[in-house]
Amino acid sequence: MKANFSLATISKNITSSLHVGFVNISSNESTFNCSHKPSDKHLDAIPVLYYIIFGVGFLVNTIVVTLFCCQKGPKKVSSIYIFNLAVADLLLLATLPLWATYYSHRYDWIFGPVMCKVFGSFLTLNMFASIFFITCMSVDRYQSVIYPFLSQRRNPWQASYIVPLVWCMACLSSLPTFYFRDVRTIEYLGVNACIMAFPPEKYAQWSAGIALMKNILGFIIPLIFIATCYFGIRKHLLKTNSYGKNRITRDQVLKMAAAVVLAFIICWLPFHVLTFLDALAWMGVINSCEVIAVIDLALPFAILLGFTNSCINPFLYCFVGNRFQQKLRRVFRVPITWLQGKRENGSCGKSSSFREMETFVS
């Protein structure tokens, strides 16, 4: 499929969308020439790494979904969020084999325009859904530790309102991808690329706008909520006098809180920094071929790092808990009741905050 896109516009778009070099880039504000064809040797390892992430992530998230579906009785609010997070991560990871093939063919999309649009939108939708559910879980954990009495009144029906809202927000965030994603022929590279086919006359504006939207909705706002909640938990727990088992539980919670924040930052910060630099390039603020080359080289690996977040989420939110381990051994029904009774009967000196803390790490 051919289109009236300039070589400059298309070549830069592949880097922005899924990701080859910038060639003869121009915008309304600036014009500069990076005429060499970029090396793609660094892409050789990407497909293999994608398949590794797909295999590991699909396995661990399938375990989470299976255990949730097999669980009898009412579901906890936190469990509902974990389940939806695992579903979003599974759907995101399911697209990786296609993108691995895309990389192995050096950005030559062989699956047709419909699959390009569908799987491009699918990837964006579930990326946002995963990040939004991580944010919801952070708020839920903050409430359970800071306001334990109020949090005990939480019912699954409350999550039944929040979960559809989160999925709707993710769908709305992915609408530009669904509308613009298409296959375009790039004669310079000899490929049919799956790209964001913005109107040529407004290409720079659209590209910069979408990049900034990803930064704000996909990183800045969620990070504010996540960091605020977990730093609030840390501040609250450090004020609480704790001894013996309470102290061990508190330290576990603090470590988990730090791990969640650090994992989110490590996995997504590189991608969003490069996305922001890309937006600056479209706006004409950056016009250095050297900087463009760095973005071109680093973007595939930054995206790869972002996908690893879907692999480690089950470990951060589920696998470390005692209750998950009990479920995995298929003996959780009686032991959980006994354990809860033991906690209440054998810990008269515990505050409600520390009982909620034990739920946090269980």
From Swiss-Prot:
Pfam families: 7tm_1. Disulfide bonds join 34-289, 116-194. It is found in: Cell membrane. Residues 70-79, 140-158, 232-256, 320-362 are cytoplasmic. The chain crosses the membrane at residues 45-69, 80-103, 114-139, 159-180, 206-231, 257-280, 294-319. It is a multi-pass membrane protein. Belongs to the G-protein coupled receptor 1 family. This is Type-2 angiotensin II receptor. It comes from Ovis aries.
